[in-house]
Amino acid sequence: MTETLPPVTESAVALQAEVTQRELFEFVLNDPLLASSLYINIALAGLSILLFVFMTRGLDDPRAKLIAVSTILVPVVSIASYTGLASGLTISVLEMPAGHFAEGSSVMLGGEEVDGVVTMWGRYLTWALSTPMILLALGLLAGSNATKLFTAITFDIAMCVTGLAAALTTSSHLMRWFWYAISCACFLVVLYILLVEWAQDAKAAGTADMFNTLKLLTVVMWLGYPIVWALGVEGIAVLPVGVTSWGYSFLDIVAKYIFAFLLLNYLTSNESVVSGSILDVPSASGTPADD
């Protein structure tokens, strides 16, 4: 018995046929606010990579080097991600479900009106790769153990993936917000580890002063992301796509590049404070355990 698929709607056919990367690329270029939010970040990420590599060139301790590498990877991921957005590779046009504030919206692409809103889903890929690096650097600075690091990083990735699901779900308005709630629940786990567990570890490790500064910066900035999501085109659509993109880009600038500079500046001046074992593995200079 042959099972037939439901007919494809005319709008779906038009969307598949008309929306190309080239049109999305030109859409970005033709919106100064949107374009600046992406290209400025590409430039800042590139400059940050060069600066951070120069700053950390003299590090010798394995733990300090691991913190440095994980921190430098943040702008490395960002420059690739923002290039994907600027090129139209990681942007789509999605029709919002019934009940969504942007239901029935359309966008001009290639001189024609296309049903849907522009969704910059590539940002979620960025966060899924860059935020674990931020947490790895923070956890190592705090002198945390492998269990807490694993917990924070895995829940962080879950937060990003479920956030992506919330952005891409078009079957139900309610399901979008359900995914959003799951993402926020995962975020609460990350916040607990940052604010409670790692704060205690950092105090014992002697890095509490810098950790607390970076912790507060990270928590305040990261709390801004779900707020921008809720207010932007993916949530209640109060903010247009250009403003939404700049909201995310501003948060990225502070939560990534400024965060990384502060951490690496501290690291290069206090290498002996963070030196020692990596995770739970004793360093080569450590005293072996008794048999």
Swiss-Prot record:
What's a BP term from Gene Ontology annotated to this protein? phototransduction
* Pfam families registered for this protein in UniProt: Bac_rhodopsin (PF01036)
Where is the protein localized?
Cell membrane
Q: Which residues lie on this side of the membrane: Extracellular?
A: 1-30, 87-120, 170-172, 232-240
Which ranges make up the Cytoplasmic topological domains here? 57-62, 143-145, 196-207, 270-291
List residues traversing the bilayer. Answer: 31-56, 63-86, 121-142, 146-169, 173-195, 208-231, 241-269
- According to the UniProt record, list the residues that bear N6-(retinylidene)lysine: 256
Give the GO molecular function terms: monoatomic ion channel activity; photoreceptor activity
> Which GO cellular component does the record give, naming just one?
plasma membrane
SMART domains from the UniProt entry? Bac_rhodopsin
- Which Gene3D superfamilies does its entry note? Rhodopsin 7-helix transmembrane proteins
Tell me where on the tree of life, at the top rank, the source sits: Archaea
Keyword Metal-binding tagged: no
Keywords for this protein: Cell membrane, Chromophore, Ion transport, Membrane, Photoreceptor protein, Receptor, Retinal protein, Sensory transduction, Transmembrane, Transmembrane helix, Transport
User: What membrane topology term does the record carry?
Assistant: Multi-pass membrane protein
Query: Does this entry carry the keyword Phosphoprotein?
Result: no
InterPro entries to which the protein is assigned, alphabetical? Arc/bac/fun_rhodopsins (IPR001425), Rhodopsin_retinal_BS (IPR018229)
> Of which family is this protein a member?
Belongs to the archaeal/bacterial/fungal opsin family.
Per the entry, what this protein does is:
Light-driven anion pump. Binding affinity for the anions is in the order, bromide > chloride > nitrate > azide > bromate and binding is pH dependent.
Protein's UniProt name: Halorhodopsin
Species of origin: Natronomonas pharaonis (Natronobacterium pharaonis)
**Taxonomic lineage from the root:** Archaea, Methanobacteriati, Methanobacteriota, Stenosarchaea group, Halobacteria
Q: Which gene encodes it?
A: hop
